Curated annotation (Swiss-Prot):
The keyword Isomerase is assigned to this record: no
Bilayer topology term: Multi-pass membrane protein
Annotated protein name in UniProt: Benomyl/methotrexate resistance protein
Annotated segments matching region Disordered: 60-101
CDD domains documented for this protein: MFS_Tpo1_MDR_like
Pfam families in the record: MFS_1
Function according to Swiss-Prot or TrEMBL: Probable transporter. Confers resistance to benomyl and methotrexate.
Gene name of this polypeptide: MDR1
Amino acid sequence: MHYRFLRDSFVGRVTYHLSKHKYFAHPEEAKNYIIPEKYLADYKPTLADDTSINFEKEEIDNQGEPNSSQSSSSNNTIVDNNNNNNNDVDGDKIVVTWDGDDDPENPQNWPTLQKAFFIFQISFLTTSVYMGSAVYTPGIEELMHDFGIGRVVATLPLTLFVIGYGVGPLVFSPMSENAIFGRTSIYIITLFLFVILQIPTALVNNIAGLCILRFLGGFFASPCLATGGASVADVVKFWNLPVGLAAWSLGAVCGPSFGPFFGSILTVKASWRWTFWFMCIISGFSFVMLCFTLPETFGKTLLYRKAKRLRAITGNDRITSEGEIENSKMTSHELIIDTLWRPLEITVMEPVVLLINIYIAMVYSILYLFFEVFPIYFVGVKHFTLVELGTTYMSIVIGIVIAAFIYIPVIRQKFTKPILRQEQVFPEVFIPIAIVGGILLTSGLFIFGWSANRTTHWVGPLFGAATTASGAFLIFQTLFNFMGASFKPHYIASVFASNDLFRSVIASVFPLFGAPLFDNLATPEYPVAWGSSVLGFITLVMIAIPVLFYLNGPKLRARSKYAN
């Protein structure tokens, strides 16, 4: 691990301040550091200095790389938000920049191994909290007995957890894009609260308290889901961003399947309460590790801190940063508009966003519905034990991993290499893969439903579930990247915040009616066939959405006031 990771970690920052800058000092605080002339108090700008800074600039340069962005969670965007090569002088202010294009303090200049380790940390963080969504579901029967409640009420803690991490990005995403807060402090503080919340969740003795605690748990679990993609974008070059996002999102997509796997073992060996003690342990381990090893990567925050250090060293109050200037121009009214109103406005007014939100919400909901459907067949028909049921969820993980190994080389061929050759690439380059994903999703649902009967082997439904998961992964990756490439950087955060909220609210209610849907359509020979077919026919119709984007994408973007 590089020294920089410890220095810029949460513990490193605290130690730096408590020691009054004695430990974990930065390069500009070294005695042999040569202060650039422009930061000196008696420096006078010349005509050689460009004295204007345009923070509203949204064009993409001739390299195909954008100059800034705002990102959200599950915010899979292909817009680079870390290019801070703005001009150095703004009137009487001196704006701090990186020390050259190859400045090692710029996260985008880190060596590949450091970037890989950072992405691993974000992915592990995402997995360690995201598995908490469905971790208790194998113990629902025991929960129903302990609290004297029905199945629908026992499913509410899952519903409220999902709603919680849909609401969270409305609060935490704007904070993570503010230079004062940055990414790491948000991750660490909310993760600490998530860990603490697992203790009363494991001890609570009534369903009302459990529901409240689960909502709060989802709320504080949301930053890594909402901002993880933005953190990846901080360190990965624009042309490699889809690959970096795919690597991170493996943790995001596989996490909910790991939950029931571990939850089934813990429920059998102990009780449903131990699923939350497990979450406390695994997220607590993540908290301790990240406190020491997760560095800050948001460019505006790093330059904001650098500006403070340079002001202290030089005594020059003219030194400032882009983030400080933006904060001085942002009113509370504008903050409320950006945070609360604009995501709703874009969802309603933008057909592209609305259609993608509906499609992704449906796909997301189907994955959560599996937590209700698997027990109907594997326990009710094939008489699997609870632990054996938990292992069936690994079929979803296998399907996602296979899809990732196919997706990454394809996207490098279709996106990364053309960008490096300085060829023009349009957002619609992602859509053919989304169409393939839609076909796999629909096919998997029919395979799962009609192979899950009383006479066939149980491997058939698992193959169908893996196929469904493969399609879902491809749809997530491509449509998120399509949105990230289609909209102006200023609106990216709102676009993804709307998607977070929309898909989470829709997905949260699916488990409530999932079991009744399949029970009412079941036949003695085919217990889940017609329920799966209903979902299959819906997703078959929805394949028309990416087809529409492929055929009319440029026209739709041309009509939008938010799109590039």
